Structure formats: structure tokens, C-alpha cells
Amino acid sequence: MVQVNENYLKLKAGYLFPEIAKRVKIYSQSNKSAEIIKLGIGDVTEPLPRACIDAMSKALDDMGTAEGFRGYGPEQGYSWLREKISEHDFISRGCQILPEEIFVSDGSKCDSSNILDILGKDNSIAVTDPVYPVYVDSNVMTGRTGDALENGTYQGLTYLAINEGNNFLPELPQKKVDILYLCFPNNPTGATITKEELKKWVDYALQNKSLILFDAAYEAFIQDNDIPHSIYEIEGAKDCAIEFRSFSKNAGFTGVRCAFTVIPKNLKGLSSTNEEIDLWPLWNRRQSTKFNGVSYVVQRGAEAVYSLEGKKEVRGLIDFYMENAKIMKNKLQTAGYKVYGGDNAPYIWIKVPDQMTSWNFFDFLLQNVSVVGTPGSGFGLSGEGYFRLSAFNSRSNVLDAMERIINI
């Protein structure tokens, strides 16, 4: 009989969001008339920008002609999209990222997991706590951790707590760590990082020859001018950081699937014989072998994000969701809740009432007012006592949910 990858057996009971879905399903089956409002998973709700729809429609028409038909595209992404990304997302901010350093993909969730394919298994790893679960679970699945402990952490990982005490900004590791996962604006806490604080991490990575895996999936939601949108705004970052970006949240592409990862050509790693190895060719080979590229139609839709009309419509989507976040934060604070995030990110991070755990509060809201959020403990040990609400929903649902919660 075939042997299984036993690393999967080390995973905790279930990925956070399937566990939420299971509880909601049980509740809905017993309360068939309940009008459930889901503010849990960070999925968008508003229609795609018209500029993107028109571009994809035209691309489909192109595919229906002999002249315009496209088969397999470049695994790295079409040059015209990579050039737009380079110009608008990086060069415009003073970041000298070349088009060929950009790899178009079908999701930053995939890329942040798949990047491990080109990194050795003996690297030491640090994650924030709480943390986006994919960072931890993907390392468990690939055998880079020890066993799960009773408190939900894993042997072999360094956890960097983020909480009220440190303004949700992790302290630098006390020892040398090879791989550092950072996400700003942060999921799940909604916290942001200044250029001065981010420079400390870049300096640490350069000094220790570490690699930063920087998730900037929510950079488009930044409202304050002094907050960096890219780690490459920090001098030296091209020598120590990989950045993940996505069209999912800013342009509503969660169901369309398009993202990109930046692998600067400066980046190097070490072989077992201490030979310096460029990371760019390794990722290029990985993608060429394991990935067939994002469809032509989808990439034309992503390209339209950078058109004048596309930028305007994307800005409208971001403003809409951030207004949702503002409404949620204001109403919850008025009701006496201690609330974080929501100013430069589409997530609200709530301190749950005393004597309640995060899952207690989840069940309390579900059972009493049919509102679904995400228990903070699902993001890590330091997330216990907190609760995440997402601003990705219709205005009417957000207003309804807030009224339900504050009137319990």
C-alpha cells in the first residue's frame, strides 16, 4: 500500500476557515430561517471593475479568431502585464523592480507556500503570532517543523508575538533566523508598519543573511502616506526580500485568480557546500516545471487595473470597503469594544469580552445574532482573546451586522 506524507498528520484538527464553515453549516441546518451575515473569511463581495470586465471580454473575442488566439502563455506572465506592474506598483514608488523580476501567478496564497520548493528544509523559520495560517501549515506539510504541541504551536518554529503590548509589531528575533514571514498591512490584526520599523527588519536580514518573505496583499488599502506599500521602499531590501502581491482584494479577483511574486535578481542563497546560488533562476525553473501560467484572458483583465478607468474603479472599491471598516470600528468602539485595525487595512481586530475565549465569542455571535467572524485563536496562540471581522461585504450587511452586535 502506498505511503502517505505523514507531515499532514501533524496538522491541527482543521484549517481555520473549514472549521468555521462546519460550525456555520451545523447552525444553519438547525436554524433554517436565520439570516446569517458572514464577516469571517476575507472574500470580496462587490462586482469586478468594468474596465477589467471589458478587457477580459475583448480578450475572449480575440481568442475566437485565428489571429488573436492564444494557447500556453509564458509561465512567468506576459511581458505587457509585467511591464505595467513594474511601472505602476514599483517604479512609481522609487522601487527599481524590473519586469523580469515579476512572476505572474494564480494567487499569493499559492506562491507563499510554493516558494518553499526552492528553499532548503534545514532553514530556521520565524512567523508572527497571530499569523495567516497558510505560512505555518505549508511549513508543516513540507516537513520543516516538529510535532504540534498542546498549545497549538509547532516545534521548530520561532513565534514572534504581536499584541496590544507591542502595538501589534513583532520584536526582532533574539537569535539568528533564516526565513522571516512578515505581512503588512497585517492579516489578521490590521496593523501597519512604518518605514523606520521595516528598516529594522531589512537591516536584521542583511546582517544575518536571512530571507524575508513579505506579504503585501493588502497594500492597496493603505490610507496614510507615510506607510510603505512595498518592502522595496527600504534600502537593501532587494538583497534580502521576496514580495507577494495579489489582485484579489484590490480589484476583486478572488474568483478570477491573478497575483504576482517579486524575486529580485540580487537574491542569493547557499548550497550545502556554501556556494552562493541565485534564487531567481531556481524560481524560474520551478514555475516553468510546475506551473502553466495564468490565462491570457485573466492577465488582460489584470492589465486593465492599471488603465486610467481601472485605477479609478479600483480606488472606488477600496474606498467602499474602507468605509465599511470605518463604520464597523466606530460602532463597535461606541458600544464599548476595544478595537484595532481598520484604518489602513480591511480587517477589524476586536478584544473579546472578559471571561470569553475567541471561540466562545464566535459561538456567542453565531447563536445569538447570526453573525460570523473569525476567532483570533485560529491565527495562533497570541490571537486568543481577539476576534477578526472583515470589511469585505455589502454596506447593508455591515450596517445590519453592527446593529445586531451592539444590541445583544
UniProtKB/Swiss-Prot annotation:
This protein's UniProt keywords: Aminotransferase, Pyridoxal phosphate, Transferase
Annotated pyridoxal 5'-phosphate binding sites: Y72, S108, K109, Y132, N187, Y218, S246, F247, S248, R257, N292
Pathway: Amino-acid biosynthesis; L-lysine biosynthesis via DAP pathway; LL-2,6-diaminopimelate from (S)-tetrahydrodipicolinate (aminotransferase route): step 1/1
GO MF term set: L,L-diaminopimelate aminotransferase activity; pyridoxal phosphate binding
Example GO biological process: lysine biosynthetic process via diaminopimelate, diaminopimelate-aminotransferase pathway
Residues with the N6-(pyridoxal phosphate)lysine modification: K249
Listed cofactors: pyridoxal 5'-phosphate
Disulfide bonds: none
EC number: 2.6.1.83
Subunit description: Homodimer.
UniProt function note: Involved in the synthesis of meso-diaminopimelate (m-DAP or DL-DAP), required for both lysine and peptidoglycan biosynthesis. Catalyzes the direct conversion of tetrahydrodipicolinate to LL-diaminopimelate.
Protein name: LL-diaminopimelate aminotransferase
Gene: dapL
